[in-house]
UniProtKB/Swiss-Prot annotation:
Protein's recorded name: Insulin-induced gene 1 protein
Residue ranges of the motif KxHxx: 253-259
Known partners and oligomeric status: Interacts with SCAP; interaction is direct and only takes place in the presence of sterols; it prevents interaction between SCAP and the coat protein complex II (COPII). Associates with the SCAP-SREBP complex (composed of SCAP and SREBF1/SREBP1 or SREBF2/SREBP2); association is mediated via its interaction with SCAP and only takes place in the presence of sterols. Interaction with SCAP is mutually exclusive with PAQR3.
Modified residues (Phosphoserine): 189
Lineage: Eukaryota, Metazoa, Chordata, Craniata, Vertebrata
Topological domains annotated Cytoplasmic: 1-66, 127-141, 187-191, 246-259
Membrane-spanning segments: 67-89, 109-126, 142-164, 168-186, 192-213, 228-245
GO BP annotation list: cholesterol biosynthetic process; cholesterol homeostasis; cholesterol metabolic process; cranial suture morphogenesis; inner ear morphogenesis; middle ear morphogenesis; negative regulation of cargo loading into COPII-coated vesicle; negative regulation of cholesterol biosynthetic process
Region (Disordered): 36-55
Length: 259
């Protein structure tokens, strides 16, 4: 026959104290590696609760990070435009006066700022598309890989002006293979491929519009030669800037884990 004290221990009374549990916001603050945060309310939307939006302690930190990344990408675009412009001037591809330094700051002064703005837009667009598609890019997420990607892109641009090919088809196929090789080596994402093709198409159309209206000129009388390598340069440039934008969006680089 069961005893009375067995029932008392097996079935707790209604007045028994429940085990104490920490609020959900305090648990997220304790797990956040960037420091303690503010406990979040229970009625917050699902996308804003702990574990879904990272460890941002201040509401304005996201905007501050966005401005910083935009400035870095804009500066990179301006510097890269100046460097590539110097390479093309040395190969007599673009039509400029003999004074190279004066050319950079007088003729076509709007080109570097436009390239910087385009770099900022593209660099911010890549991680946004990755987040929207739910496919975070994790292939070669390190600054050393980004630096190698920049070097390969500059090499492709230099080869497009330096190497001599028998016809435009051979030039286009060679540069297309190099550009796809750059994407396969440093990106390998569907979003990166799609954005690169879109950027190449739109940028080539804008360049043709500027040339046909006399805003921008090339030394080569055959513009078909220029159009044969422009899409490849824009494609590889979009992939390169996208890798920089993704790396900047990471914040603190993650250490590789071996499972």
């Amino acid at each position: 026959m069961p005893r009375l004290h067995d029932h008392v221990w097996n079935y707790p009374s209604a007045g028994a104290a429940r085990p104490y549990s920490l609020p959900r916001g305090m648990i997220a603050a304790a797990a956040c590696p960037q420091g303690p945060g503010v406990p979040e309310p229970e009625h917050a939307p699902r996308g804003q609760r702990a574990g879904t939006t990272g460890c941002s302690a201040r509401p304005g930190s996201w905007h501050h990070d966005l401005v910083q990344r935009s400035l870095v990408l804009f500066s990179f675009g301006v510097v890269l435009a100046l460097v590539l412009n110097l390479l093309q001037i040395q190969r007599n591809v673009t039509l400029f006066p003999d004074e190279v330094i004066a050319t950079i700051f007088s003729s076509a002064w709007w080109v570097p700022p436009c390239c910087g703005t385009a770099a900022a837009v593209v660099g911010l667009l890549y991680p946004c598309i990755d987040s929207h598609l739910g496919e975070p890019h994790k292939f070669k997420r390190e600054w050393a890989s980004v630096m190698r990607c920049i070097a390969v892109f500059v090499g492709i641009n230099h080869a497009s002006a330096k190497l001599d090919f028998a016809n435009n088809v051979q030039l286009s196929l060679t540069l297309a293979a190099l550009s796809l090789g750059l994407w396969w080596t440093f990106d390998r994402s569907r979003s990166g491929l799609g954005l690169g093709i879109t950027i190449a198409f739109l940028a080539t159309l804008i360049t043709q519009f500027l040339v046909y209206n006399g805003v921008y000129q090339y030394t080569s009388p055959d513009f078909l030669y220029i159009r044969s390598w422009l899409p490849c340069i824009f494609f590889s440039g979009g992939v390169t800037v996208g890798n920089i934008g993704r790396q900047l969006a990471m914040g603190v680089p993650e250490k590789p884990h071996s499972d």
